[in-house]
């Protein structure tokens, strides 16, 4: 059942791995060159999040990034691509444990959206970030993988996070 992909490491970058752990679960991980406190801030402060979340190769503009990072708090990200209509992604934070763990719902697909869990484990001044995406069905994960909105995109996204964190130390 396991499907693994990995980006190749370069001198300044770490490897991003993606693994399908079950029919509904995708896990993406990467060691980021910075302490957990700073990496966590990059995930929870809109002014930092906007700098790395959207893969540059997509040509998307992040028009707005509203984040109320607390249990029960909501988030909403609005993207635009060229002349197309803006698209929104939104949900609710269900768990916030600085600087170790974030859990949120993805509600733009209705009640049966995916749930994202991100853990941050610091070791030696670097932080292992593990993002787990639990989809409502095998078909939903299959569709996400087919649209390349998961593992491939996360390689570039995590590279951008790594590059930003190095500047924040």
PLM ranges: what are they?
Residues 2-59:
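Hydrophobic ligand-binding cavity/cleft-lining segments
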Residues 27-28, 47-86, 169:
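Short beta-edge strand/loop motif at the mouth of beta-sheet-based domains
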Residues 30, 64-67, 89-95, 106, ...:
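Hydrophobic/aromatic beta-strand elements that line small-molecule binding cavities or substrate pockets
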Residues 36-37, 68-70, 94-100, 119-128:
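A short, structured loop/turn motif at beta-sheet edges
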Residues 39, 49, 75-77, 93, ...:
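Hydrophobic pocket/interface hotspot
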Residues 84-89, 111-113:
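Short coil-to-beta-strand transition motifs
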Residues 103-156:
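Beta-strand/loop substructures that line and gate deep hydrophobic ligand-binding cavities in soluble
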Residues 163-169:
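Generic C-terminal helix-cap and adjacent flexible tail
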């Amino acid at each position: 059942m396991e499907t693994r992909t990995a980006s190749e490491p370069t001198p300044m970058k770490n490897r991003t791995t993606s693994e399908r752990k079950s029919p509904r679960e995708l896990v993406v991980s990467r060691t980021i060159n910075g302490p957990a406190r700073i990496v966590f801030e990059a995930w929870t402060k809109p002014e930092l999040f906007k700098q790395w979340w959207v893969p540059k190769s997509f040509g998307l503009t992040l028009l707005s990034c509203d984040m109320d990072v607390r249990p029960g708090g909501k988030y909403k990200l609005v993207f635009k691509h060229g002349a197309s209509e803006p698209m929104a992604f939104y949900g609710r934070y269900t768990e916030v444990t600085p600087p170790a763990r974030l859990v949120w719902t993805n509600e733009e697909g209705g009640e049966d959206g995916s749930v994202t869990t991100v853990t941050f484990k610091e070791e030696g001044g670097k932080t292992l970030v593990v993002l787990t995406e639990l989809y409502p069905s095998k078909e939903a994960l299959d569709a996400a993988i087919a649209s390349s909105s998961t593992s491939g995109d996360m390689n570039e996204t995590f590279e951008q996070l790594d590059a930003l964190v190095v500047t924040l130390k």
